[in-house]
C-alpha cells in the first residue's frame, strides 16, 4: 500500500539510495512556467521552483512518467544536500505542486500543474501568501 506523505500517514527519512519515480499529471506550457516564476516563486523561493522544474524535466513527455531514479543522482544534479531538498520539497507540497507517496524504500513524486492566475488569486491561502511576500 502506498502511503501519502503529505497527509502525515507515515514518518519517513529520505536516504540517498532511496529510489523514486515521478508522475506528471499534465504537460507544462509557457504560461505555466510564467505562473510558477511570477506567482509561486515569491512564496516558496527559487530553489523550490528549480527542484520542481528539474523533477518535471525527468519525466518523459509521451508517458508522463519518469524512469526509476535515486535521490543521490537528483541531489548531484541540483547541487544540494538532502536536508535542503526535503525543506524545499515540503514547500512544493504546501502549495499543491507535489504530493509524495512512499512504500518501503521507494517513493513516488506526483507533480501537479500550477493553478492559472485567476484560480491562484481566488485561492485565499496562495493570494494571502503572495501578498505577504510582495506587499502592495
Where in this protein do the model-derived segments appear?
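Short recognition helix of helix-turn-helix/winged-helix DNA-binding domains
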Residues: 1-64, 69
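Alpha-helical propensity feature that highlights long, continuous alpha-helices across diverse contexts
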Residues: 4, 23, 102-113
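Intrinsically disordered, low-complexity segments enriched in small/polar residues
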Residues: 10, 38, 50, 107-110, ...
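Non-catalytic, interaction-prone regions of core transcription and DNA-replication machinery
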Residues: 35, 102-103, 124, 132
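General N-terminal targeting signals
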Residues: 53, 61, 86, 102, ...
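Winged helix-turn-helix DNA-binding recognition segment
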Residues: 58-109
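Short, amphipathic alpha-helical interaction segments positioned at domain boundaries
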Residues: 113-136
Amino acid at each position: 500500500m502506498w502511503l501519502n506523505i503529505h497527509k502525515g500517514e507515515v514518518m519517513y527519512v529520505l536516504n540517498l539510495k532511496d529510489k523514486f519515480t515521478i508522475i506528471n499529471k499534465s504537460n507544462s506550457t509557457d504560461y505555466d512556467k510564467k505562473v510558477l516564476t511570477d506567482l509561486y516563486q515569491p512564496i516558496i523561493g527559487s530553489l523550490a521552483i528549480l527542484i520542481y522544474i528539474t523533477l518535471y524535466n525527468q519525466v518523459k513527455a509521451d508517458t508522463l512518467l519518469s524512469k526509476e531514479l535515486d535521490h543521490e543522482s537528483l541531489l548531484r544534479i541540483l547541487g544540494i544536500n538532502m536536508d535542503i531538498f526535503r525543506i524545499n520539497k515540503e514547500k512544493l507540497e504546501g502549495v499543491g505542486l507535489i504530493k509524495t507517496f512512499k512504500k518501503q524504500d521507494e517513493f513516488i513524486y506526483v507533480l501537479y500543474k500550477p493553478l492559472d492566475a485567476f484560480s491562484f488569486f481566488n485561492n485565499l491561502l496562495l493570494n494571502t501568501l503572495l501578498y505577504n511576500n510582495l506587499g502592495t
